[in-house]
C-alpha cells in the first residue's frame, strides 16, 4: 500500500495556465498530507520566455512543489505560427517536446522506485493542450493520466462536439455561416457559430482542435476549473455520458494574490488603491483586457468618449496594440484627463485581484478570460463582455446567454475581426452594468456565495477533489 505519493503536472508554458496548475497543486498538498510532492514540468518556449521565472515566483514558499525545467528544443515551431494559430503552435511544441517529457517522467519514476522511501508517482496531470501525452507518456509508462481543463465545462462540451461535426464537415468553421446555430453538448441554448473560438475558423488551428478533441476520452479523468453550482447543466450531461472519463468539478481555482507586471512599481499599486479608497462603494467601473488583450488607438478614443458620455467613475488599464510599450496618456484624446479629473484614473498595469476585491468597484468591462471571469464572480462583480482572443467569446456567451450573469458589450468582437466598437455601444453597456443591473448584481453576489460554499468541507468542489484524490491512492495501491 502506497503511503505517500507524487504527482507530475505538465502545463503549457503560458502564465495563465501555469498559474492555475500551481494553485491546484497547492490545494491538493494542503488537502491531503499523503501527497508528498508535486513536480511541475516546465517546458521552454519562445512564446513565453519568462515562464520559468514566473513559475518559480509562485512556488517560492512551497517546499513540496518542485519545478523541473526541460531544456529548450533545437527546432521549436516557427514563431509566426504562434501569432496566426496559437493552438497549432502549442500542439506542435508538445509533440517536439514529447521525448524530453518522457525521459523526465521516466527519470522521476525510476528515482522513486529505487529510493528508500515509500513515495511512488501516482499519475500525470496534463494541460488540455498536452493531452497527446496520455498515450505517448502516461500509457507508455503505465501511469494514470488526468486532463486538467483550465477553462469551463462548456468548453469540454465544445470539444465533445468537434469530432461529431468533423465527421460530417471535414473542414474549418465558416464565418459566413456565423448565425447558424450549433447543438453543442452541455449548453442550454444552441450557439451561433460566430461565438465559437476564433481558432476553429483558421485551418491550421482547426486541425489542432481536431487532434485534441477526441483524446479527452483517453484520460483516466478530467479535472475542470469550474463548480457544479455555476454550471449544473454541463456537469449533469457529463455525469450521464457513457464511455467517457469521470469529470471532476474542482473549481474555482484562483490565485488571490496579485502577480506584478515586470515593469510595475509599488507606487503604481499604491496610487491605484489609494484612489479607489476615496471612491464611494460600487461606484467605479473597471476596464481591463488581460495580459494579452490590447486595443488600437482609434478604439482607445471610442472608449474614452464613452466614459465621458456616461459620466461614471472609472479605472482603466490600457494596453495598446503594437510591439512598443506606449504610455497610456499618449493615446488618449487631447484634454481627456482634464475633463475626467477626479472621477477617472488611467494606468498601464493594474493589480486586478486587489481591484476586483475593492468595495469601490461596481462593474468590470472584461475580455472574459476564464481566470478573470472566476475572479469577478468570486468578488461578486458583474461583467460587461468584450472578448479578445482564445475561447473568450464562448465564455461571454456562457455568461450572458446561458447564465444571465453579464451584460453583452460585443460578444462576437473577435469574429467581427475586431471591428471598431463604437462609443454608443460601450456607453450603453457601461450604463446597463452600473445603473440598470440590480437583478444581475444580486445573481452575481449569489454566485460568489456559491463559489465559497463549493470549496468548504462538504461543498461540491471539495467532494469532487476528494474523489479524485481517493482514486489516485486506489490506483497507487495496485501499482
UniProtKB/Swiss-Prot annotation:
Gene3D superfamilies: Glycogen Phosphorylase B (3.40.50.2000). An anthocyanidin binds at residues 17, 390. The active site is at residues 17, 127. CDD domains: GT1_Gtf-like. PROSITE patterns: UDPGT (PS00375). It holds the Pfam family UDPGT. SUPFAM superfamilies: UDP-Glycosyltransferase/glycogen phosphorylase. UDP-alpha-D-glucose binds at residues 150, 350, 352, 367, 370-372, 375, 391-392. Keywords: Glycosyltransferase, Transferase. Its EC number is 2.4.1.91, 2.4.1.237. It comes from the Eukaryota. One of its GO terms (molecular function) is flavonol 3-O-glucosyltransferase activity. It catalyses: a flavonol + UDP-alpha-D-glucose = a flavonol 3-O-beta-D-glucoside + UDP + H(+); a 7-O-hydroxy-flavonol + UDP-alpha-D-glucose = a flavonol 7-O-beta-D-glucoside + UDP + H(+). Possesses quercetin 3-O-glucosyltransferase and 7-O-glucosyltransferase activities in vitro. Also active in vitro on benzoates and benzoate derivatives. Belongs to the UDP-glycosyltransferase family. This is Flavonol 3-O-glucosyltransferase UGT71C4. It comes from Arabidopsis thaliana. The gene is UGT71C4.
